[in-house]
Design a protein with these regions (language model features):
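Ligand-binding clefts/hinges and TM-proximal coupling segments of bilobed small-molecule sensing domains
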Residues: 34-40, 50, 171-188, 224-226, ...
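A ligand-binding cleft/hinge motif common to bilobed small-molecule-binding domains
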Residues: 105, 120-130, 175-178, 192, ...
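Periplasmic-binding protein-like
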Residues: 138-147, 210, 214-254, 273-297, ...
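Extracytoplasmic small-molecule ligand-binding "clamshell" domains
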Residues: 35-118
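Extended ligand-binding regions for polar small-molecule ligands
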Residues: 34, 38-39, 79-83, 87-88, ...
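Bilobed "Venus flytrap"/periplasmic-binding protein-like clamshell domains
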Residues: 55-64, 74-89, 122-126, 140-196, ...
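Acidic, polar ligand-binding/catalytic clefts
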Residues: 83, 95-158, 227
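Short helix-initiation/N-cap motifs at beta->coil->alpha
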Residues: 41-42, 96-108, 151, 171, ...
Length: 303
């Protein structure tokens, strides 16, 4: 019974976090004017054009980037980027179907051709870049650790001997494995399950992207974020290998949206005003270019 109540509490917390992030969608982002400007850019891939709509994989449990709203619709930053792609391709924001994906399922879903692309909080890694192509970056994330208010973890090295939850297949799984070998790790397929492990005290902390954890901490008076920030690595849109026409279209439109500062417009309509300062440098803007890391994989660099 206690576990059931805790699970219900986590579901409520996720819903509250989603509601806290939810704001009015940016009306007309990437609309007719952008469509005209995009006319001379690489053409829409034939498969998408003939279908008359996009099919895009997005997260459904990751506010404020991809989640299900109270009215049962897809919402979030990634979803608004998908709608902008729809406007740029077809002149309307509703020419897109969404497929819910999780961290471990998103690349297989892309490779099996169930979707055209994935806009799903996909952090760049060299290993992933060997099996799929990345677009130019469209967001820059930072890792954080969510802990109970009464936790004795004050720095990352305090995780030694403790149990930390995160999602399977995430960059945090590999970083913990490489750099914190004395830390036990609970791996889950969804963020809600990883959060549940923290809530029912199976885990001493939940490691994940700041964008998700800030919303949780803001709605749970029993938790807080450790001050340490780590693994500041951009996200890209996932594209199948060999689809050069798709890569050309996506990259050109991301660059167009960057030049028009449309990612910041989307972000402003995704997060509450009090978080503007926190996230203002997380999106590509005319004077803010995000770059993927070079050299050793960040998840192999310990601190």
């Amino acid at each position: 019974m206690k576990k059931l109540l805790t699970a219900v509490g986590v579901a409520t917390l996720i819903a509250a976090a989603s509601a806290a992030w939810t704001l009015a969608a940016p009306a007309g982002t990437g609309g007719t004017k952008a469509e005209k400007s995009a006319h001379a850019l690489p053409p829409l891939p034939a498969t998408v054009k003939s279908r008359g709509r996009w099919v895009i994989g997005v997260k459904c449990d990751f506010p404020p980037f991809g989640y299900i709203t109270a009215s049962g619709k897809n919402g979030g930053y990634d979803v608004e980027v998908a709608k902008a792609f729809s406007r740029l391709a077809f002149g309307k924001g509703n020419r897109v179907s969404y497929v819910c994906v999780t961290t471990p399922s998103r690349i297989p879903t892309l490779q099996s051709k169930r979707v055209d692309i994935i806009i799903s909080t996909l952090t760049y890694t060299k290993a992933r870049a060997e099996v799929i192509d990345y677009s130019v970056p469209y967001y820059g994330a930072t890792g954080r650790l969510l802990i109970p208010n009464n936790s004795n973890i004050t720095k990352l090295s305090d995780m030694s001997g403790k149990t930390i939850s995160t999602t399977r297949g995430s960059i945090y799984e590999r970083w913990l494995h490489n750099c914190y070998k004395n830390t036990n790790v609970i791996l889950t397929d969804t963020t809600s399950s990883a959060l549940l492990a923290l809530q029912d005290r199976r885990a001493a902390g939940f490691m994940y992207d700041d964008a998700f954890l800030v919303g949780v901490a803001a709605n749970d008076p029993n938790t807080k974020l450790l001050a340490a920030r780590f693994l500041n690595i951009p996200w890209g849109i996932g594209i199948r290998k060999g689809e050069s026409d798709m890569r050309a279209w996506v990259n050109s439109r991301v660059k167009l949206m960057k030049a028009r500062d449309q990612f910041w417009v989307i972000m402003q309509h995704t997060i509450p005003r009090r978080f503007y300062t926190t996230f203002k440098n997380n999106v590509p803007r005319p004077r803010n270019t995000l770059k993927y890391p070079t050299g050793p994989d960040p998840e192999t660099i310990c601190r």
